[in-house]
Amino acid sequence: MSPTIFREGSFRFFFFSREESRMHVHVSHPDGEAKFWLTPALALATSAGLSPKQIKEAENIVAVHLEEIDYAWRTHFPG
């Protein structure tokens, strides 16, 4: 299961229900995908198919929505 947190432009932001416990978010785009760590600081974990410009755009969107992503994570993974 991979609940969508939100969509913005051509990006979809989501996480997988049965994955590691360190807070992170996955990003999909028609051109590729990326994963960003949210703790201890926002950082790119992996990417495939996205241009540097698309990665930066996704990272900026994640930064703007950090509180929303954090809330979704803590709601989905209580405790």
Label each region the model flagged:
Residues 1-11:
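Negatively charged, low-complexity tracts enriched in Asp/Glu with abundant Ser/Thr
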Residues 5, 43-47, 65:
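Generic preference for hydrophobic/aromatic residues in regular secondary structure cores
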Residues 6-8, 24, 68, 72:
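Alpha-helical structural elements
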Residues 14-50:
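A short, structured beta-strand/loop element
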Residues 49-79:
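C-terminal structural segments of small proteins and small subunits
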